[in-house]
Amino acid sequence: MALRVVTRALGSLSLTPRIAAVPGPSLLPAAQVTNNVLLQLPSASMLLPSRPLLTSVALSAKFVSWKSRTKYTTMPVKMRKSGGRNHTGRIQVHGIGGGHKQRYRMIDFLRFRPEQESKPGPFEEKVIVVRYDPCRSADIALVAGGNRKRWIIATENMKAGDTILNSDHIGRMAVAAREGDAHPLGALPVGTLINNVESEPGRGAQYIRAAGTCGVLLRKVNGTAIIQLPSKRQMQVLETCTATVGRVSNVDHNKRVIGKAGRNRWLGKRPNSGRWHRKGGWAGRKIRPLPPMKSYVKLPSAAAQN
């Protein structure tokens, strides 16, 4: 131990001789000349580490985010991870960071999107392949119809070679619901299992998109449809909103075993704080009433009716 201390002390000593100040032809006093020479030639021990000046340098203007793309493509698009931070660099979502590099595949959540040159009305598409998507929990399917291809969320039993129907027609009688088809809620029979539900007509699916989830069409009231979400909460939308029949694919997603902490880092999940936290009022079982029904239907007010 003593030998190690002596070795470190000898290593810290500088073996280079100190630079002597040579007085030259100057009108300044000798002491000030010596100080100027020492300031011009600092020793290596006086150089302290400094922070870079360009800490807020702007990103490259050539990089185009996948969110700003206006032309649809089925090819994987390069994606830059945010690490849970916004454009100012502040953390907005904790627990995000790292992970394997991923490429984004643009999903078309608007199932009834006829081509410009096609006839108006229902149209069919054929499933080409069903594959894994690293950016979401559910599997995705590549479908083709007419002169285009697009990615959609796959249902539970969807496989290559299947034919799916996309319709916007609401008839007097309910249609025969077939898994993978997309119909307005007003055309489906009550009790149908649905997924990828729109909140507004033509906006695209926003609800029930995670792996293995499904909702239930409870009832139809005055041109609206009441849906039960996977959280048991009810939602009211117009009957012209489109939904897909069936259950979302990858049903066993919640049964997977991570196995080790490193796999969570592969998936881009950062560890939480190891500090002990006291459990608050959220912990434990309790009798809690269901939240009120969420409605996307703009009902006329009482003042407008009068």
From Swiss-Prot:
Name of a matching Pfam family: Ribosomal_L2_C
Compartments in which it is found: Mitochondrion
A GO cellular component annotation in the UniProt record: mitochondrial large ribosomal subunit
Transit peptide as recorded in UniProt: 1-60
InterPro entries for the chain: NA-bd_OB-fold, Rib_uL2_dom2, Ribosomal_uL2, Ribosomal_uL2_C, Ribosomal_uL2_RNA-bd_dom, Translation_prot_SH3-like_sf
GO biological process, one term: mitochondrial translation
This protein's UniProt keywords: Mitochondrion, Ribonucleoprotein, Ribosomal protein, Transit peptide
Keyword Magnesium: no
Superkingdom of origin organism: Eukaryota
Primary location recorded for the protein, binned into one broad class: mitochondrion
Entry's Gene Ontology molecular function annotations: RNA binding; structural constituent of ribosome
Family named by the database record: Belongs to the universal ribosomal protein uL2 family.
Quaternary structure and partners: Component of the mitochondrial ribosome large subunit (39S) which comprises a 16S rRNA and about 50 distinct proteins.
Full protein name: Large ribosomal subunit protein uL2m
